[in-house]
Structures are given as C-alpha cells and as structure tokens.
C-alpha cells in the first residue's frame, strides 16, 4: 500500500491514531522508492536498514502527537552529511565516504524523529544544472524520462515529484533547489543565507550555499523548514534572526501586497511560452488583491558572469581538501606524494568539477585577481543594491524560475555556457543572500513551468503567504506525472 498521496498532516493523524506505524510507513515508502527507481534514478543510496531501525525505535517509544514530523520519512541530498549512511556528493572522489557525524539539518530532523530513507542523486559536488555530472547515474525528469530533472538537486526533486517520498532536502548555490523544483512541478525553497546551518554540507561556494526543503505543497515545504532552520554555533555564517513558525501567514489573503515584476526577467533569453505563463500568473495575483508593477534590476544581466567567477573561486579553495590522504578515493598508480595529489584529483574529479577548479584558480591567481574576483565582488554589490532599492517599495519580486522548460538529456552537458545560462534567473538571489521559492505555475508542451517568488532577507513567511494564496486558486500542484501513480 502506498501513502504518497497523503499530506504530512494526514500521515501524522494516521500515525497518532495507530492506523499505521512508523515501520509500516517506512516500508511503504521503501516500496515506493524501489518501484520507481529504475525509471527515474533519484537515489544514490537507499538506507533501508538504518531507516527501519529508526522506525522501530520510534514505534517502541510511541508517536508524539505534538510533533508533526514524528515517524515521517525524509530523503537527503548526497552532499549533506549523514552518520552511518554514505555521503558521496555524487563523486568518485567520495564514493566510499561514510561520515562520522550528521549535518545540523539532519540532526534537527532526527531530533524531530524523522526517518532518513536515503541519499539522492545530484550533480557532482553540486556543480551542474541537470544532474548529469553525477559519477553514479543520470536522474530523469519525473514528467518526461527523456528530459533532465534539473540540478544540482535533481534527485531530491524527482523523489518528491514521482511519489517516492513526500519530503526531501536539497542545497542551492545558484538555483539548485528552485530549478529542479520548477522542472518537476514541486515546491522548492532556497532560504535566506544563514537560515539553515551549513555545518555538514559539503562546501561548494561558501558565500552562496544554502540547504532548503522540497515538498509537493507550500505548507508542507514550510513545515519542513520549521524543522531544519536553526542557529548553530558550528556555522559562523548562521544568521541571528529566527522565525518561530514559517507557516504562520499561510492562509492569509494578500490584498494590498505589492509585488514587483522585473522587466529583465521577461526579456532576452526567456522562452515566449514561459513569459505567457508568468503573465497569466500575474493576473492571478492581481485577482487575489495584490498590486503587480514592472521594475528594473539593471545589473541582474551580469549575474551569471559574476556567479561563475565567485562560485568557482570558492570551489577551487574548498575542494583542495580532497587529495586522497585522509578519506575517499586515492589513485593506486601513484609512486610519490606529488603523484598521489595529481593522480587522485585527476581521476577522482569529473570534467565539470575540474573545469570549475581551473576557472577559480585562474580567477584567484596573481595578476588576474583584481580583474576577475575583485571585480566580480564589486558587481555583486551592485546586484544587492538593485534588490535593496526594489524592496524599499515592494514586498516581493515575481518572475519565472527558469528561462525554459526542462531540456533533453545529453543536449547541454557538452555546452557549459548554455548550461550555465539556465540559471540566469535564480543566480542573483544567491548572490544577494535572499530567500526564493519556486512553485508550480503551469505547463508548456506537457512540461512543468515554475514561478519564482523572491523576498527580502528573512521574509520566508511572506513568500509562503503569497505562494500559498496562488496555490489555493490553481490546481497545478495537484497534477501529477504518470509515475506518481505507480506506472512507469
């Protein structure tokens, strides 16, 4: 029996009433994963033994009626550390790495008696926009198995969209939660930088990375954020601002809310059908009582260039720790220390990771630092100032999540620049450290379109309020791919 059509609140009621046990729910979820995995390839590791052990322990002490997440399964992106469960970052470099600690986000989930059911596929070290750079497999879009799921958190998105699991965690450095959420018609939130601890997240771009939730609905997404968001002394970038309940504004109307629509988000590079879908969404928000006005974010056009200098520079530094000495892959043909370093990194990293390490090393090198890294930092400040000006007069910003719908497998993975431009609309949010959500907003030729809502820092409650209001008057979130029902 499958429970994948039940909301978290409905599952909680069943667990509290003892109509099902945590073990039965876990077993049903494992079956949902196994029956769909060959078709979509969402998971690198399914932690069946660990999950059933956790479920048995929860059943033994009883479901906590006051704890919504007690006994609820959770899928976790494979760059988030999980004790006793392999954490590979989808790389040959970490193919056998089993952490001795949990990431704070995972520890928070365990503290609420959630059950980690497995680790999801991703682009290697979160570098990619299609989940095709994974060392292990290519994940497929839940709606069309010939299309990419987006990236880098592709497995976390398809696991939810295909009905394998109700909730999952991803990470977002330049759009890695929101883009796959859009491509698979689920809800994905990138929180304000510092809202969720980065402790235990395998670092890519330290000034950009943020862990966030995937769910089928806005409310369930907020409920999962309630679990994982916390201040953390182990993370120096943990934000001091704390929200008591991210669901608190869900259900309120949005009459009088002022929403900005940047003209740059509907300009060059945006598919006409995506633009039409967004403009239809604007009418929905206006019908709900919000005011939507056109604005300008003039420096957003530089976002992709700025991002790939800063993110690659940070990655080139962060990935120096992977050298074959302490853990992970080590080349067996090395005859001395230099060869251990060179051969291990040459063989252990994939092409995209090596490309970004080289780009970042170049940007930080003597003679080029001022021209590239320093200049990128200055333009990043201009992008932040653009957002600040808009948010002085508006509550939220609205636009498409992606410039196109999901593209075909093996179509852009040999064209890095085209792949990078797929993050055109999500990258500025990371550069500014802002919260952004992607929600289902329609379909083009049978493929999902995502609508992005962006807020000022710590405005997740307002984002959820507006997203839930839109969700309540549309049915896109209720439409499911064929695989959700069990058919391939």
Curated annotation (Swiss-Prot):
Task: Please name the InterPro entries in this protein's record.
Answer: Amidase (IPR000120), Amidase_CS (IPR020556), Amidase_dom (IPR023631), AS_sf (IPR036928), GatA (IPR004412)
The record's annotation in Gene3D superfamilies points to: Amidase signature (AS) domain
Quick check: keyword Signal in the entry? Answer: no
Q: Which reaction does it catalyse?
A: L-glutamyl-tRNA(Gln) + L-glutamine + ATP + H2O = L-glutaminyl-tRNA(Gln) + L-glutamate + ADP + phosphate + H(+)
Q: Which UniProt keywords apply?
A: ATP-binding, Ligase, Nucleotide-binding, Protein biosynthesis
GO BP annotations listed: translation
Q: Which family does it belong to?
A: Belongs to the amidase family. GatA subfamily.
Q: What does this protein do?
A: Allows the formation of correctly charged Gln-tRNA(Gln) through the transamidation of misacylated Glu-tRNA(Gln) in organisms which lack glutaminyl-tRNA synthetase. The reaction takes place in the presence of glutamine and ATP through an activated gamma-phospho-Glu-tRNA(Gln).
**NCBIfam families reported for this sequence:** gatA
User: Which protein are we looking at?
Assistant: Glutamyl-tRNA(Gln) amidotransferase subunit A
Tell me what organism the protein belongs to: Streptococcus pyogenes serotype M1
Gene designation: gatA
């Amino acid at each position: 029996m499958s429970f994948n059509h039940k909301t978290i609140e409905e599952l909680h009621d069943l667990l509290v009433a003892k109509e099902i046990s945590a073990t039965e729910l876990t077993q049903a979820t494992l079956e949902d994963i196994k029956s769909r995995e060959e078709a979509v390839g969402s998971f690198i590791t399914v932690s069946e033994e660990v999950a059933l052990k956790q479920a048995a322990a929860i059943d033994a002490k009883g479901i906590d009626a006051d704890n919504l997440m007690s006994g609820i399964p959770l899928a976790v992106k494979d760059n988030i550390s999980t004790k006793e469960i392999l954490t590979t970052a989808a790389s040959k470099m970490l193919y056998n790495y089993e952490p001795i600690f949990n990431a704070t986000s995972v520890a928070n989930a365990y503290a609420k008696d959630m059950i980690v059911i497995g680790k999801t596929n991703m682009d290697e070290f979160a570098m990619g926009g299609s989940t095709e750079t994974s060392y292990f497999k290519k994940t497929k879009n839940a709606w069309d198995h010939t299309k990419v799921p987006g990236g880098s958190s592709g497995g976390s998105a398809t696991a939810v969209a295909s009905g394998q699991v109700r909730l999952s965690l991803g990470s977002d450095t330049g759009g890695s939660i929101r883009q796959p959420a859009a491509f698979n018609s689920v809800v994905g939130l990138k929180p304000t930088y510092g809202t969720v601890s980065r402790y235990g997240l395998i670092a890519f771009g330290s000034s950009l990375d943020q862990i966030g939730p995937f769910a089928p609905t806005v409310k369930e997404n907020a409920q999962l954020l309630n679990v994982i968001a916390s201040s953390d002394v182990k993370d120096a970038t943990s934000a001091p601002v704390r929200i008591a309940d991210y669901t608190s504004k869900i259900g309120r109307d949005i009459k009088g809310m002022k929403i900005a629509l940047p003209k740059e988000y509907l300009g060059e590079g945006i598919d006409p059908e995506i633009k039409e879908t967004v403009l239809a969404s604007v009418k929905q928000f206006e019908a709900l009582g919000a005011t939507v006005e056109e604005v300008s974010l003039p420096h957003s056009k530089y976002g992709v260039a700025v991002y790939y200098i800063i993110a690659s520079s940070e990655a080139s530094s962060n990935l120096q720790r992977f050298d074959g000495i302490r853990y992970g892959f080590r080349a067996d043909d090395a005859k001395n220390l230099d060869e251990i370093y060179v051969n291990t990194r040459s063989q252990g990293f994939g092409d995209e990771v090596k490309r970004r390490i080289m780009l970042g090393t170049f940007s930080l090198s003597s003679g080029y630092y001022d021209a590239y890294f320093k200049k990128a930092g200055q333009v990043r400040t201009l992008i932040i100032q653009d957002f600040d000006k808009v948010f002085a007069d508006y509550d939220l910003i609205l636009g498409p999540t992606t410039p196109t719908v999901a593209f075909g497998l093996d179509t852009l993975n040999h064209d890095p620049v085209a792949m990078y431009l797929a993050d055109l609309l999500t990258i500025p949010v990371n550069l500014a450290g802002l919260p952004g959500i992607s929600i289902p907003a329609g379909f083009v030729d049978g493929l999902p379109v995502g609508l992005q809502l962006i807020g000022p820092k710590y405005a997740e409650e307002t984002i959820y309020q507006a997203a839930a209001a839109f969700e309540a008057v549309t049915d896109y979130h209720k439409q499911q791919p064929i695989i959700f029902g069990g058919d391939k």
